[in-house]
């Protein structure tokens, strides 16, 4: 009887698996408002690069919005976390900063070359091997340098007017005006008060019940009442979709700054066609843009984003092979039609998480918004982007960069911190994640060699039965 009742009460295994997949991929992990707020958390990087490529290299904005929309939707559903879709930054930098500027066809070949490399690394298993054996301190150094680089750029956006066509800061930003310092600083104040230092949103808000408000008050009921009020206030503040409100404020200011935008908007997307690509385009795109982009994509778009996903979502750590294949497939589909080369960046994941994104639905909502805009306004949407307050973009980018940099705080030894900081310093000084990565690996190996016992090689040392027994203990 007991066995029968037990078996009848036991849920089926395949039913549990379906429920697990549903919970991981198709359920909201946070409130709808927080997921929507997190969706715009990486636009501080996305908008400036898209705007620059559109103005300088004649990137087809409509095609880019439509394809990146499908990327967002598909990766959000497949990975079950707020997987970002961001521009390939090195390709974008080469395209607009070097002369002559890269053409859309050359940008496409650079993206396709990078994508093919990542696809091969992912399918062959080499990316998983690299991810498994790469020292954590080196990865943290790459993350720290990328986060600080975002933060430095963000401060420039906030303090100075920007000329995205020349990729340079111009005059100091004025205090007043619709893109003045007061707007930017007010946005920072609002985000800090509503989101704090990035504590967990919703019902997991941090509790301070152990800390009495007044030291000489020893009444437990009084302390409990005050801590309850504090927790209630924190829950209310955390429930505010802060980043979404700041972003919507920026959109409203676009139309106030230049009311003629409304007349310039044209309905309907541009025609999606295959690019005409020559062998010369392949040569220029690969040599000038793909070669510097490939190591950055391997480190930041795959290795760093997988490590960060394990930090933020311990039960949903990403597979390096799957992420690498994802980047490859996205670009090998979209680049032929002139879509901007994209990747999965750790900075984007940090930014979206920072403002409340906890599930794949966050980027699904973002993708739906991009799709509507791309189909409704097409290339004319660039008029709105060109008037978006740069100071507000800087604020969003600042919080994303700091969140990414804070992932490096888990170094437990001085040796790990030493490797991480050297890697970050070289990356920032040389403006090359690959250079910092190489120096970090070399330093890591030197430190290991320094502590190695050279008196008797380990493979010549006889191994006792006790050693065998100890090694078998898990």
Protein language model features and the residues they cover:
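Membrane-embedded helical hairpins/re-entrant loop segments and their flanking transmembrane helices
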Residues: 18-36, 52-74, 289-361
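Hydrophobic, membrane-embedded alpha-helices of multi-pass small-molecule transporters
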Residues: 32-37, 41-43, 174-187, 242, ...
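Short, amphipathic, aromatic/basic-enriched membrane-interface segments that mark the entry/exit
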Residues: 32-40, 53-59, 76-83, 171-179, ...
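Transmembrane alpha-helix interface/packing and boundary motifs in multi-pass membrane proteins
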Residues: 37-38, 73-83, 291-295, 329-339, ...
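Transmembrane helix-boundary motif of multi-pass solute transporters/channels
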Residues: 37-102, 312
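Short hydrophobic alpha-helical membrane-embedded segments
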Residues: 39-46, 62-67, 84-88, 178-186, ...
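Transmembrane helix boundary and interhelical junction motifs in multipass membrane proteins
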Residues: 44-48, 84-92, 302-304, 339-348, ...
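Membrane-embedded alpha-helical modules
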Residues: 99-261, 365-474
């Amino acid at each position: 009887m007991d066995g029968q009742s037990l078996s009848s009460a036991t849920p089926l295994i395949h039913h549990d698996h379906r429920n697990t997949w549903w919970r991981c991929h198709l359920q909201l992990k946070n409130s709808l408002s927080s997921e929507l707020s997190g969706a715009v958390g990486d636009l501080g990087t996305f908008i400036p690069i898209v705007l620059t490529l559109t103005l300088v290299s004649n990137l087809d904005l409509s095609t880019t919005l439509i394809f990146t929309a499908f990327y967002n939707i598909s990766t959000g559903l497949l990975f079950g976390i707020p997987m970002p879709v961001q521009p390939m930054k090195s390709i974008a930098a080469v395209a607009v900063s070097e002369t002559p500027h890269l053409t859309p066809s050359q940008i496409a070949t650079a993206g396709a070359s990078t994508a093919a490399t990542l696809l091969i690394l992912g399918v062959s298993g080499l990316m998983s091997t690299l991810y498994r054996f790469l020292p954590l301190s080196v990865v943290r150094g790459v993350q720290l340098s990328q986060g600080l680089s975002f933060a430095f750029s963000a401060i420039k956006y906030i303090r100075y007017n920007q000329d995205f066509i020349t990729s340079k800061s111009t005059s100091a930003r004025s205090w007043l005006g619709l893109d003045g310092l007061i707007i930017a600083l007010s946005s920072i104040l609002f985000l800090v008060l509503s989101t704090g230092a990035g504590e967990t949103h919703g019902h997991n808000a941090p509790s301070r019940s152990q800390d009495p408000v007044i030291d000489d008050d020893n009444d437990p009921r009084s302390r409990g009442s005050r801590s309850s009020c504090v927790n209630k206030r924190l829950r209310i503040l955390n429930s505010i979709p802060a980043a979404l409100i700041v972003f919507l404020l920026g959109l409203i200011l676009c139309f106030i700054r230049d009311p003629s935008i409304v007349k310039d908007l044209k309905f309907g997307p541009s025609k999606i066609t295959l690019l005409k690509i020559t062998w010369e385009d392949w040569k220029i795109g690969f040599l000038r843009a793909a070669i510097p982009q490939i190591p950055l994509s391997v480190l930041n778009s795959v290795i760093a984003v997988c490590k960060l996903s394990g930090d933020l979502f311990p039960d949903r750590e990403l597979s390096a092979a799957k992420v690498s294949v994802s980047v490859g497939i996205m670009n090998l589909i979209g680049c032929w039609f002139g879509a901007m080369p994209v990747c999965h960046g750790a900075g984007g994941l940090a930014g979206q998480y920072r403002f409340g994104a906890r599930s794949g639905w966050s980027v699904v909502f973002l993708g739906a918004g991009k799709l509507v805009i791309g189909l409704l306004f097409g290339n004319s949407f660039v008029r709105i982007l060109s008037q978006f307050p740069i100071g507000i973009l800087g604020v969003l980018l600042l919080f994303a960069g700091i969140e990414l940099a804070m992932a490096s705080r888990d170094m437990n030894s001085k040796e790990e911190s030493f490797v991480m900081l050297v890697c970050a310093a070289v990356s920032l000084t040389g403006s090359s994640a690959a250079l910092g990565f190489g120096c970090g690996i070399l330093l890591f190996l030197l430190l290991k060699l320094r502590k190695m016992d050279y008196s008797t090689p380990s493979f010549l040392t006889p191994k006792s039965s006790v050693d065998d027994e100890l090694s078998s203990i898990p």
